[in-house]
């Protein structure tokens, strides 16, 4: 419990500092707003905390203004009209009002970057099921483990500069039914390599087509199935992809 309190205290202090920075002229830059939840699984909170620090530190060089909130009621029309990109770090909206505001935002041309657990919304939100590619969560490995990942489309801006294959840090890898690849509107960017299987001990992924990152061309969105624990930023490859994804969402390009 001491670890959780420490993480929350550090996060609160950082958010206060971020709010002070955003009160300065950076507000003229396109706005990126991240949503997170304090609570739930600690590994998800640790990722959210680390990601917010990095987004905040890179905002000036990236040409955007960054803010974060744990108040999901901020996901409303009044706020979103001024936001270029919405990020879900370790949760998803729970109320009808929040979800409907997000639907209007995305169908109106907004942009979204979602990590890991945010994909669980497919099991209780029909619109989001279609948004993510017409899929539902199926299974995952446990414990969290590293895995070899292959780049599917090296020409896409989101994976620009990534090696064709690499070992990603420990993660709870999700599989989906059906595979997102079966949707003609989905472009898969990363996939688990078949050499990983069987993957897991208590819960095992035994094979199949398991995409790790993709876009749905009907929307301006990127889903990345990593965000479990604080190892994502321990190697340069995944952070580079996150930077690419945000850059692509801010500045549409092929």
Positions of PLM-derived features:
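Catalytic beta-strand/loop cores that center a nucleophilic Ser/Cys/Thr
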Residues: 138-218
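Helical hinge/lid and interdomain linker segments adjacent to catalytic or ligand-binding clefts
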Residues: 29-122
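Hydrophobic residues at beta-strand termini and immediately following loops
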Residues: 69, 189-191, 224
């Amino acid at each position: 419990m001491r670890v959780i309190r420490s993480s929350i205290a550090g996060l609160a202090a950082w958010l206060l500092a971020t709010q002070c920075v955003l009160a300065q002229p950076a507000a003229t830059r396109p706005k990126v707003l991240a949503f997170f939840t304090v609570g739930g699984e600690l590994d998800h909170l640790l990722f959210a905390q680390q990601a917010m620090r990095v987004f905040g530190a890179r905002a000036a060089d990236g040409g955007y203004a960054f803010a974060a909130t744990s108040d999901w009621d901020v996901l409303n029309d009044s706020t979103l009209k001024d936001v270029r990109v919405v990020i879900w770090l370790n949760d998803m909206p729970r109320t009808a009002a929040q979800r409907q505001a997000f639907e209007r935002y995305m169908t109106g041309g907004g942009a979204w970057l979602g990590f890991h657990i945010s994909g669980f919304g497919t099991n209780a939100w029909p619109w989001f099921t279609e948004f993510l590619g017409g899929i539902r969560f199926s299974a995952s490995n446990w414990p969290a483990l590293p895995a070899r990942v292959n780049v599917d489309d090296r020409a896409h801006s989101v994976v620009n500069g990534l090696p064709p294959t690499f070992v990603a840090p420990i993660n709870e890898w999700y599989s989906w039914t059906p595979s997102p690849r079966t949707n003609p509107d989905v472009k898969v960017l990363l996939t688990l390599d078949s050499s990983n299987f069987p993957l897991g001990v208590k819960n095992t992924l035994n094979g199949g087509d398991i995409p790790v990152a993709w876009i749905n061309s009907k929307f301006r969105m990127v889903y990345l199935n990593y965000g479990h624990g604080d190892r994502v930023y321990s190697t340069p490859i995944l952070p580079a992809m996150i930077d690419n994804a945000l850059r692509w969402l801010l500045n549409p390009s092929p």
